[in-house]
Amino acid sequence: GDPAELITRYALPKLYKLEQEYGSFITGTIKKGFKKKTSDELKVTRKVFSVKGGLSSLTEALYKLSGKDSFILGVSDLKPEYKEGKFHISFSNSQNENITIIANKLITTSGAFSLDTLLTFIDNESLSKITNLKYANVVEVILGFKNWNGMNPDGFGGLIPSIEKRDLLGVLFMSSLFANRTPENGTLFTLFLGGMRKPEMYNKSENEIKAIVEKEFVSLMKPSEFEPELFKINYHKNAIPQYGIDSGERFDMVDKLENQYKGLIIGGNLKGGIGMADRIKQGKELAVRACG
């Protein structure tokens, strides 16, 4: 994101809380280190972890435990309506059958950009306070080497500050971060381009991206030769929401609409943080609200 536009209070609430309680982020970090921790806090570590088999293992496990019959996949022509305090959701399933479900509650976790075509029963003026949220497009590049010969990638990786004027946003050392991500002696990197800093990267061809990555990666990691066995490019549209100065207005409108349409619960990365941990935390909160 663009640091000049991000509002700490919304984008980094934990840092903002430290600043409010202790006067500054640095002072707060130091003083909190001496503060007596609860038994639950003592269980928390800062160790980076993932899921065996990748994050799809997590969603697959949730899918199975929740009961596959609870899900309808491959739907189209989704049209929710709000009538007499109920949600009437019409759609076509994967067999092109027309189905209507009547529900007391409706939960959305899609991006803000899709709500105007999804929640058509809400007036455009109100929804625009939510759908005007900016998103950064990101290009993800995965590099894999069977026999790495360059700087030792022992660590997390790093973000690249804008002052360096590079075309990369950052590099993650995936094979150091997570176990069993590569064959024995293999090395895996994930690179990011684009974002609010370099939005033009998203529109570049794969050949252009490859040329940029080779130049930047060789400069950063100093391999004796650049011949990755794996070179994969993924384009992610609307990847990262930008919590700017209008965020407070957006959050207020979410609350207003949820009060106006009883049973409507609006989630997703348009509120509550942008990271994976934020999504898991919010998922539990939404489930508790829906069951309440």
Kindly give the residue locations of the regions a language model identified:
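Active-site/ligand-binding neighborhood in enzyme catalytic cores
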Residues: 1-80
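Nucleotide-sugar-dependent glycosyltransferase donor-binding/catalytic pocket residues
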Residues: 51, 134, 272
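Active-site acidic short loop of glycosyltransferases
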Residues: 68, 103-104, 261
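A structural signal for the hydrophobic beta-strands that form the central parallel beta-sheet
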Residues: 71-73, 108, 266
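Mid-domain catalytic core of redox enzymes
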Residues: 76-189, 194-203, 207, 215-220
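Conserved flavin/dinucleotide-binding core of flavoenzymes
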Residues: 153-155, 173-292
